[in-house]
């Protein structure tokens, strides 16, 4: 049994650290130094047949020269409910092949099936046990009411493990081993009817931490999407909420799906869906626990504005010399399609790409001078 003292030590809010985090954040920034003007993966791409509503969220990582995309495919009706979690691969970032379906949701729209909708597949490698883990969200689903948003509610985080040992097992097949986080007696007041809507684990020292998210979807209009931290001694848990410091003070109203990257100096950066127009959000941390106020990274400008809404970044992929590849999903902007739920257009989701550079703040302005 984990003692209260150990929990407090793992999640303690050291007073001087937020000041140090803020100081570090002011010294660094992410800059887009190459924009790809068209989406690189759409419902019209090879291998995407039968994917009615496109792609949303997930993670891309690079392993021995191959890019691996784990994403949510919105394959049918009900929209945002009938889903597949898929694995795609690419050697050049631009041309993709679908490798497999990892899991498929039931599409049940009665509110009874806890796996009616599946979202946000996040592959994480357990170095100690030499196995890939796949964390993803499973929701109950039902028609919305004037008061409640029920399309995706009571999210639970499932953990699956690859049956193939070692890094070569990244493609699975994956076998479910259980739920690691859900709304219940251990929840905090800021957690709402949506349940746990995202989960991303990362290593800090000899412990694991994870961002997890939620929203009070029991009352429309929905005012807040927030994230907080949980920690565990091992990747397989048990996962314990950092209630003393939750929710994270990164964004005022909307933050979803943070994905963390460890930088060369041992500090941390996370990218996330922020609702920023034509962009995504990012935040820095010195210790992986205390995070700076978020900033916007604009990923679509000029002729490259193909999305009506830029949605979810899929993680920063180090390419060397402080350059990162950043894939993201967004809804393609089709003329004549009005926004519906939460001002989002039900147009096909696609994947875009930018190259990003980590710089000292103001470096470009100084170079111009």
What are these language model-derived features?
Residues 312-315:
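Short glycine-rich, acidic/polar surface loops and turns
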Residues 8-20:
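Bacterial N-terminal signal peptides
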Residues 1-5:
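N-terminal secretory signal peptides that target proteins for export/translocation
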Residues 24-118, 124-198, 202-256, 262-308, ...:
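Beta-rich carbohydrate-recognition and catalytic domains
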